[in-house]
């Protein structure tokens, strides 16, 4: 069975706060899937291949937090995907400190990033992403969010070292209970993001 090296586990042990885990996630190059093959890599594969996209970074972040007493949670942010208006979903790692929620996030953009633990509940945390969640032409697209998915309770104890893609996690995030953020009437009245916001949304951390 494949396992983490001792020095890797020691490095994880040093990441004692969510902020330090986020710094570590930011240091990992972004996975652009340049060979055209979709992946959902395990934390072990992320380290071996030294890249991660959104859900891969989230799974790694959840695993590292679990080593420090946090449950390994994922939260699915679901975007509009009907008709001509289509956007990407996002996955973050909710964590709770002193009764308040924050989130880890692996993204290549200046938006949809780490959230400090200052939010009273999951919905409040989710809504902090709402105004940053828009297409290149400024249409706001965040529509639903899931209940937190506990990887430790839902999957066997090898998910973090799997050599196979973790499509089961991706599929479970789609299946679990979701909550609508707003009504159709409210959606119809949404204002476009400002030009300067759209320009900021084009800033990237890693180049292809």
What are the language-model segments listed below?
Residues 1-208:
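A structural boundary/capping signal
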């Amino acid at each position: 069975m494949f396992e983490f090296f001792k020095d890797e586990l020691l490095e994880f042990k040093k990441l004692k706060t969510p902020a330090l885990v986020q710094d570590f996630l930011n240091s990992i190059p972004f996975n652009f899937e340049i060979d055209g093959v979709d992946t959902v890599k395990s934390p072990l594969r992320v380290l071996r291949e030294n890249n991660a996209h959104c859900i891969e970074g989230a799974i790694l972040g959840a695993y590292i937090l679990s080593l420090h007493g946090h449950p390994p949670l994922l939260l699915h942010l679901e975007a509009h995907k009907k008709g001509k208006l289509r956007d990407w979903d996002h996955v973050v790692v909710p964590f709770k400190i002193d009764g308040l929620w924050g989130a880890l996030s692996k993204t290549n953009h200046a938006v949809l990033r780490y959230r400090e633990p200052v939010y009273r509940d999951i919905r409040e945390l989710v809504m902090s992403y709402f105004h940053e969640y828009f297409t290149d032409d400024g249409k706001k697209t965040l529509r639903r969010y899931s209940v937190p998915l506990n990887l430790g309770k839902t999957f066997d104890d090898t998910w973090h070292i799997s050599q196979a893609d973790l499509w089961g996690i991706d599929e479970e995030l789609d299946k679990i209970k979701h909550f609508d953020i707003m009504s159709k009437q409210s959606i119809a009245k949404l204002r476009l993001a400002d030009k300067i916001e759209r320009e900021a949304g084009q800033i990237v951390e890693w180049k292809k």
